[in-house]
């Protein structure tokens, strides 16, 4: 349920949803404003919370692996 709310709030943008789940939706809104105009990869690289940055990278790496291999 919570992930569905985040998906709606962030227009199904997976990196933003993952970052919001781990680091809080308000923080993601601030980061998206700060890094407006950058692509998703650059957004992820600029996440200032070390834990959230690592979390998003790990989940996206797994997501792409399974998407490409299964």
Regions found by a protein language model. Give the residues of each.
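Catalytic and substrate-binding regions of cell-wall glycan-acting enzymes that process beta-1,4-linked
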Residues: 12-70
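Flexible, glycine-rich surface segments
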Residues: 1-14
């Amino acid at each position: 349920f919570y992930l569905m709310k985040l998906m709606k709030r962030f227009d199904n943008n997976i990196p933003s949803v993952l970052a919001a789940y781990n680091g809080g939706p308000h923080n993601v809104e601030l980061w998206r404003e700060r890094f407006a105009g950058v692509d998703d990869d650059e957004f992820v690289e600029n996440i200032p919370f070390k834990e959230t940055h690592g979390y998003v990278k790990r989940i996206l790496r797994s997501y792409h692996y399974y998407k490409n291999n299964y």
